[in-house]
Structures are given as C-alpha cells and as structure tokens.
C-alpha cells in the first residue's frame, strides 16, 4: 500500500471555493482563500447560516488508547466520506496539528490511508499560521509580565507566583526549566521559568472555546498569571496585555476549511492539549459546521473518559449544541493490551504474540470498551462501536468485540476506511443513522436518552472532581495533597467555584496510573495540585505527572523528513 503522503499527493482536489459552495458558504462573503485548497471562514457565517436546518451532531471518541493511537481522526474522516455513499451530506471538524508531534514520534494529524484531510502537508506544517499566532499571543503576554516587573512592579506581583511560562511548537525537553533575566540589570528580573509546547497554552484552549471575537477578547483578559502580595489574582487585563493578544489572534479565530480525499468538507481549527485542556476542535467551527450538512462529525482527544467527558461538560455548555450520537473507536490490538498481558510501546515493534488469534484476551480487555460506552451513555448519548480493522485481525476477535458491545446495548460496525476510504465505513454510517432515528423515536414515546451534563455548575469544585472520578473513571474515592486542598479553597473564595473541571491525568488508563489497564476497580484518584485556566473557563486538577513540553525520541520523525529534488516534502506521516 502507498504511504499516507503518497496517497495524499496523488489526490485530485476540488477548488476550495467549490467545497465552500457545497456547504452553502458564499465565496465573496464567507471565504478567504489561502491558496487553491485552503480557506479561512469568516465568523459572519454563524449568523448568516442560522436559519438553515441543524445537522445531526456526532462525536467520535475511543476506548483508552495505546501509545500508538487507535484511529479516531481516520475514523472521523472515513465516516464523513461514508455518508456521501448513502446519499447524505457531511461536514467534519477536527483539531489542527502541532508540528512538535509531527516531527517527533506521533506523526501528523490528518488521518491516514484513504481517509485523510488534504493537502496533508499543509495541515501538518503551518496551515494558515494559527499555531504561530497562538505562540506569539502567549509570548506577548509573557513579555508584558516581565516588562511590568522590570519597570517597578506597580501591581505588586509576587515573582514566584507567576505561572505564565513561554511556549513554542517544538518538542524540546531542554527548555522545560530555565532561568530568565540573567546578565546585566537591564536584561530583566531573574526568575525561574520554562517553556511549554504551544498546544498546552491556555491561549490555545481559549481559541478552541471562544464563541466570537468579543468572547475571545474577554477570555484573554480573564487569564490569571499569578497573584500579588495580598494573595489576589493578577490577570492579563491587569498587565494590559489582553488587547495586543486579541489583535494577534484576530485572524486565527476564523476556522480553516479543507477537504478530505473524497471531497468532504473539513473544518480544521484549534488544537488544545488533550491532557490538561479539552482536546477538542473549536466551538466556532462547530457553530458553522452544524448548519452546513445533514451530519456534523467531530472528534475528541484520547478515550471517552478524557476528550468526550470534556466535550460534553465543557465544550457543549459553551456552544449550546447537543450531540445526537457518539462513536467509540476500538481496535483488536488495544483491547488485547487492556487484558494486561501485553505491552505496547511507542516506537517499538508490536509483540508478535499480540498478532496471534486470541478472542479470550480481546474479551478480557473489552471491560475497558464497556466502561467507555457507559461513559458516553452517562450523558444521555447513544453509542456505536467502530472496530477499526487491521489486516492482522481475526473474525473471532471482531465477534468478541461485537458481543461485548451488545452486552451494554451498543451497535457495532467493522470499518475498513483506512484501505477503502468512505466505502469502508458505510456500515458505521448506517448504524449511526439507525441509532439516531431509534433514539428519537424512543424520545417521542417518552423514553430514549436526552443529553445531560454530568454535574451542575453550582456544585462545589471538590464535589465535581469526585463525581468525575467516581462516575467516569470508576475510582472508589479521591485523595488530595494539602496544596491541592488549599488551592481549591482559594479558587472558591476567588469566585471560580462555578467553573467546570478538566482533570489532567494520563490518557493511557482510566486511572491516574498508566500501568493499570482495562477497567480497574478499588483504586483512588490522587490529586496533587489544582490549577486554574480562568480565561479558558475551567479548573484543572493535576493527577500524576503531566508533561507540558514533550521531548524527542532517540530517532524522531524529523530525521526522515526532507525535501526531494523537486521541492516536495518526503518522510511526513
């Protein structure tokens, strides 16, 4: 089979104006082309399209993934393409790629095989410059903070309390912890700081959650960068940095329009970290996309306990949109890993025994699948399982997954969209169509599921944390470090108690221990500290060790990426 890059490069793409017209977007009013195959979509489209019918809203989530990922983006793309094979129109909405992982071990974020967003080089490298704008806006605030300290510190900011570091879109472990302001007195105030990757910036989370340019400006002003000598929070507005940040982001808030290999419209916008932020694409992309097709399909990072929970309880609160169904992507290899009998490591070959026929291990690991389906249903949303099929799978293993899904009342579809494109996900599209129609019929009869949040915003922060830990992760309790309890009390006093919570934990387990596979029981969630993203609008407790600046592997993808003699990119995947 051809590589992802070879497949993408061989595609015949539609002019982006034609893609926009298929969505009801007008070239002269709504589209700002960036070349022939990418365009920005003006936010006036939200109002202009508001009288059009709403699409059915589908979330693509997954079981707890292995370090290799289980194919959510590929499934999102394949499903979007599949609907056209059954006479329906679809728009997909996905996150923007970060160049750090693209040059690291993870690779790009355009999907794969015959289910990709194209041009894939554009998506994975720069696109329209949104990540650079986020980087510049973030670092502008960092410069304003240090400039304020240098010029007398009129706000009385405690330098040790400053939590606003700098960012860049490169995996570079050597910048995690640095000392700034060294040299002469004129070189600034020395203090310890560091760099995070751009996707971990609160500015990126704000870009994803802002519902308008005005909302973006307000959220930027609410960013808390530290506290003063009296212990009161100091904001980006206080250091007079928010206005300049908004100017830098004025174009970045507009979603990017691209297309799949089969011409399905793709809105590509924002890329917040899935660990410490929502891991979802932007609210504005969904507000536009929901009026452009019969189905709007979006994805959420990592497993249903992570991205989907945040999608439901954070993103949907802001957008006001309610999902009609969710897909839980599962693979045979990941479910075998969840049996606890295999180890999968990023960058290492798969264990040979993992590829042998073993439906018993699939069933053992399927406890994770069943819990993730339950996590979707907790929110009143029906779930359909997508088996992302690999050539090494066996029919008996697919049957084991189908049996596990049936136990918890979920339909199941085997998908081969990686090798077949949209045709390979038609079974999934039909299963979703039937599931949504069935749920609507049940609702009309007084039954069926209705979308609901897991907790009310009035609930105290501590209780919100414990609700997620118990109901979503399956923990029997929560243990707090003293520092975490003090932070929670401080946030309640500061008026942040009505914010939703976004628990930062490993994506490799339902628990906070990446080594615990399946659906572990009898464990307690440990919260060691709690931080606030007040601008983005959530509190994030830290559970376990979180890296916000990745490092490169011994042999990163960057070693293989180059230009050929004709100036074409080679080695990108």
UniProtKB/Swiss-Prot annotation:
E.C. numbers: 6.3.4.3
Keyword Acetylation applies: no
Encoding gene, per UniProt annotation: fhs3
SUPFAM superfamilies, per database record: P-loop containing nucleoside triphosphate hydrolases (SSF52540)
CDD domains the UniProt entry points to: FTHFS (cd00477)
GO biological process, one term: tetrahydrofolate interconversion
Superkingdom classification of source: Bacteria
Catalysed reactions listed for this entry: (6S)-5,6,7,8-tetrahydrofolate + formate + ATP = (6R)-10-formyltetrahydrofolate + ADP + phosphate
rRNA processing is among the record's keywords: no
GO MF, any single term: formate-tetrahydrofolate ligase activity
Protein name: Formate--tetrahydrofolate ligase 3
Pfam families per record: FTHFS (PF01268)
Keywords: ATP-binding, Ligase, Nucleotide-binding, One-carbon metabolism
Originating species: Rubrobacter xylanophilus (strain DSM 9941 / JCM 11954 / NBRC 16129 / PRD-1)
InterPro entries, alphabetized: Formate_THF_ligase (IPR000559), Formate_THF_ligase_CS (IPR020628), P-loop_NTPase (IPR027417)
Pathway: One-carbon metabolism; tetrahydrofolate interconversion
Family: Belongs to the formate--tetrahydrofolate ligase family.
Top-level enzyme category: ligase
Residues that bind ATP: 66-73
